Regions:
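A conserved short alpha-helix in the GNAT/GCN5 acetyltransferase fold that borders
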Residues: 71-76, 100
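C-terminal "cap" of GNAT-fold acetyltransferases
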Residues: 113-146
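Acetyl-CoA-dependent GNAT
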Residues: 6-51, 61
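Conserved acetyl-CoA pyrophosphate-binding loop and the N-cap/start of the following alpha-helix
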Residues: 63-71
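A short, internal acetyl-CoA/4′-phosphopantetheine-binding micro-motif in the GNAT/acyltransferase core
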Residues: 56-64, 89
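Conserved GNAT acetyl-CoA-binding A-motif
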Residues: 77-88
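Conserved catalytic-core motifs of GNAT/GCN5-like acyltransferases
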Residues: 87, 105-119
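Conserved active-site alpha-helix within GNAT-family acetyltransferase domains
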Residues: 91-108
C-alpha cells in the first residue's frame, strides 16, 4: 500500500466537482493524497489575502498523519495565515462533522446562502490546530512544497 503526497492542477480538478466548486490554477493551490496511483483526498486553497485563506476539502478514503500535517502546514507555516476558512453547506452533514472533528469551529452562519439553505463558515487558527506538532509532523516523509 503506497501513499504519496502531491500537488497541482490534477488535484484541484479532482477536488472541485466533489465540493461543488471550481479550480483555477492561477489563483489557487491544491494538495492531494495518492494511494496506489489514485487520488483519495485533496484540498484546494484559494482567496489568500495575507491573513486568511479559504479551503475546500474532499476525501474518498482514509487520511494519513503525514498528509494532515502537510495540509495544515501549508496555510499556517508556509503562507503564514492566521486563519483558515472552510465554507460548508449546513445540509452537508458529512462535511460539517469532518470539519468539527478536525478542530474547526463555526464562526458564522449565513442564511439562505446555498441552494440547500444556510452556509456555515468554519474557521481554524494555528494555535488551535492539532496537526502541526510532532505527533503528525514526524510522520511526514515528504513535505509538500506547493
Amino acid at each position: 500500500m503506497a501513499w504519496s503526497i502531491t500537488h497541482g492542477a490534477e488535484v484541484g480538478h479532482w477536488v472541485a466537482p466533489r465540493v461543488a466548486g471550481q479550480y483555477h490554477a492561477e489563483m489557487s493551490q491544491a494538495i492531494g493524497l495518492v494511494r496506489e496511483g489514485k487520488i483519495v483526498a485533496g484540498v484546494i486553497y484559494e482567496n489568500w489575502n495575507g491573513a486568511s485563506i479559504v479551503t475546500h476539502i474532499a476525501i474518498e478514503g482514509r487520511l494519513t498523519p503525514g498528509y494532515l500535517y502537510v495540509i495544515y502546514r501549508f496555510p499556517f507555516v508556509q503562507c503564514g495565515a492566521r486563519k483558515i476558512i472552510a465554507p460548508v453547506s449546513a445540509t452537508n452533514t458529512k462535511s460539517t462533522t469532518m470539519c468539527e472533528d478536525m478542530g474547526f469551529i463555526i464562526e458564522a452562519r449565513i442564511a439562505d446562502a446555498t441552494p440547500g439553505g444556510d452556509l456555515l463558515m468554519f474557521t481554524m487558527t494555528a494555535d488551535k490546530c492539532k496537526y502541526l506538532g510532532d505527533r503528525y509532523g514526524k510522520k511526514c516523509q515528504s513535505p509538500a512544497s506547493a
